[in-house]
Amino acid sequence: MDQAYFKDYYHLEREHWWFLVRRKILAERINTLLNRPRQIHSLNVGAATGTTSDMLMEFGEVMSIEYDEECCRFTQGFLQTPIIQGSILDLPFEDNQYDLVTAFDVIEHVEDHQKAVEELWRVCKPGGHIAITVPAFQFLWGPHDEINHHFRRYTHSQLLQLLEPLKGKVIYSTYYNSFLFFPIAAFRLLVRFLHTLSGKKEQPPARSDHEVLGIHGWINRILSGIFHLDYYWLKAGLRFPAGVSLMIFFKKSD
């Protein structure tokens, strides 16, 4: 991938409704669930162009790691915290090093996701926290997943099962992006049905949801407003039984 791609993605992460509101939701959840943490040491795995790392700076020092070497080099040019290239399957850090370890929409990109969460657990301090977000429900699989090289989508029980071997406990979990769940599900299922009805064997060109829905204008504002309902719902202490995405917070045993 060239620098032009990462420049586009830089703006996408800072302007698109999904990235903007997700970041706001995550900051609020971290602040609430970790009891207004300050001066903690966080590791952000899969930092991309750094917006989640910027968000984590609110809570203390941040180390970032990104698998894509070119993306890492691009982000190093402006990120205010350290970022290095590396893999979630072999994190280049000592055991028990970080108060908070985050993997926001990362483990779905990894074939050996069990090894991935074990590495997150390994570098987390005893009594520290791991925060994970993933796309939800395999029946929502579509071109967005293919173009982003996902291996899977998750249910709540599947994510719990993945974390079960780790020593510690889940302190919080919920689906989110839920007010848009039914429209998005209907759209994806309709696209799949129409393709089947057409009788064509070849798949249409894969397009990301971010490309389909765009980042500018009234569509972005409307979808941002709807997604903000999730923010207020979760901030009020409520949870969702279904959604396009899923989040979980895990506390490592002391």
Tell where the protein language model's regions lie, with residue ranges.
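Conserved S-adenosyl-L-methionine
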Residues: G168-S178
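Conserved N-terminal segment of class I S-adenosyl-L-methionine
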Residues: M1-N96, L100-F104, V117, G217, ...
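Residues lining the SAM
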Residues: F104-I107, T133
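Short conserved AdoMet
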Residues: M57, Q76, E111, K125, ...
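A short glycine-rich, Lys/Arg-flanked "PGG" loop and its adjoining helix->strand segment in the class I
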Residues: Q114-H129
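Short, glycine-/aromatic-enriched active-site segment of Class I SAM-dependent methyltransferases
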Residues: K7-E13, A131-R152, H156-E164
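Feature marks short, surface-exposed loop/turn motifs that line or immediately flank catalytic pockets
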Residues: C71, Q138-L140, F179
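A C-terminal cap/extension of S-adenosyl-L-methionine-dependent methyltransferases
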Residues: L180-D254
